[in-house]
Amino acid sequence: MCIRDRAHHLLNTRQVAFIYHVKADPAAPVQSIATVSETADDVLSGAGSRYGPVAPLTGLLAALDRDAPFAVVGKPCDLSAIHNMAKHDNRINKLITHRLAMVCGGQSTAQKSREILHNAAIQEHTVTLYRHRGYGLSLIHI
């Protein structure tokens, strides 16, 4: 079962109230942001590999403040950081009932994505969708 399917299952069986993960930034699709998905459709719209820098735990405290069980999807280093945070915040082990890790090949830089755009003669501000995997590298721009 892939991570997306596992997240759908957790939501559909009401084991969690939401999934905390990253997705493409709607305002800048080459970049990524942390997000909360409450439905399978939300998870699907945010699914897909994201390469480049992202601060995946920026909204974690707000997610914990919702006081509802949830799952986190992240890189192993993100989940390790959450494990370490649990030593200082007992809500983590109570509320984060599932931690889903993906295989990580290491951190990439945003410069790699910009180089791809440059080589394709596409200006970043014209990009409306940027996918790294799942459909091959997909760029949609205006």
Where are these regions (language model features)?
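Iron-sulfur-associated redox domains of electron-transfer enzymes in respiratory
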Residues: 1-141
